[in-house]
Amino acid sequence: MKGMLKGKTQRAAWVEDEADAATREAGRWRALVLLAVAELLGMALWFSASAVVPAIRSEWKLSEAGAGWLTLAVQLGFVAGTLLSALLNLPDIISARRLFALTACCGALANAAFALFATDLTAGVALRFLTGMFLAGVYPPGMKIMATWFRRGRGMALGVLVGALTLGKASPYLVNALGSSEWRVNMLSMSALAIVGGLIVLLFVTDGPYALPAARFDVRQVLRVFENRGVRLANFGYFGHMWELYAMWTWLPVMLRASFAARGAEASLAEMASFAVLGAGAFGCVTAGLLADRVGRTPVASWAMALSGACCLLIGFCYASSPALLFVVAIIWGATVVADSAQFSACVTELGDPQYMGTALTLQTCLGFLLTTVSIHLIPALVERVGWRYAFIALAPGPLFGVVSMLRLQKQLGRRKAESVMIQVE
């Protein structure tokens, strides 16, 4: 009788475990979809002004350099926000969900203030800086929340998240092509989307089963991130990637407009092409994430950077040539330039201290975006001197440095795996 009761108890426990596993599996896919949608909507603020720069330049009588500051201000604001967040360990000591929702809504308000009240470059740069600073609470916390739901398939999950971010940053170009001819209306629509994204995370997303209790504030964690050699190499790869990425995202649409205009194509075609090129990164991110979970993060990141680096060298020679040829090279560049992005973050979540994962991700992002301010500022200066034909070649050293860093990380991980096998044999 006791044996029968024991057997029934074991079967009941097994059924309960199976039910819990099914619930967790459904929960993680629900979280993936909701976070991806929220990230897409929240990060639509990033290029909301860049997409309408031609109209702003005309209205405010801005130079090319002045218009560039509207994008650069977002980068600088993001750097300031991520640095403050990392120093205070914000993503680890408070709810990442609440941080995401609060900063998405604050960023939306700063963006709306730009649309409603900005009338000159000084006010515009200040409000774009605030927008970037608040977006520092959207991207890294989103990655942390996603990591609490995924261990198996984390590369794919983070790839989906970065892909959604990429589509979000591309979306203002689509709105500009299809939406109102009034740039202020288009920017306000981006603010509305960001608020919806913040509310989605606050109301419908929960932390996953791999979440850890809130950590204690420890400013030393900022320095400890670089004591871990694996994390350090992953960060170096990320820095090479970032040297290229945002300068390409910022200035390739400008180059497409100029090249299409030189061939007599309609302006709306350049806007659609810009959306397609930047949006192609979403496909690249998801594809790279799926591959990375199968063959490894370091080789996939290396392949992506090798391809995007080749596009840096080639794209300028397509300027003012056939729009179709330029678009083909640009779409390949758009798909590969961001494909590796999530894998650097995945490496940090897997190789670093899980208790301070949010701090490590935020610091990685902060330093990477600080580097982008240099390359973004460099490209227009080169265009004035050597033209579009050669300007983007200056971005190629970034992916080259990234490939070298990833190959060194691959070598270290292989050595660590071999040592682990030897210990198990002994």
Regions found by a protein language model. Give the residues of each.
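Hydrophobic core of transmembrane alpha-helices in multi-pass small-molecule transporters
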Residues: L40, A110, T122-G137, P323-A339
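Intracellular juxtamembrane helix-capping segments at the cytosolic ends
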Residues: G137-F150, A339-D353
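Flexible cytoplasmic inter-helical loops of multi-pass small-molecule transporters
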Residues: L203-E227, R416-I423
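C-terminal transmembrane helical hairpin of 12-TM major facilitator-type secondary transporters
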Residues: V295-C347
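Helix-loop-helix hairpin linking two adjacent transmembrane segments in secondary transporters
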Residues: R152, V160-V205
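Extracytoplasmic gate region of multi-pass secondary transporters
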Residues: A49-V53, G230-A282, S345, S375-I376
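Conserved MFS/SLC helix-loop-helix module at the cytosolic interface between two early adjacent transmembrane helices
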Residues: T82-D120, A292
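Cytoplasmic helix-loop-helix junction between adjacent transmembrane helices
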Residues: L127-A164
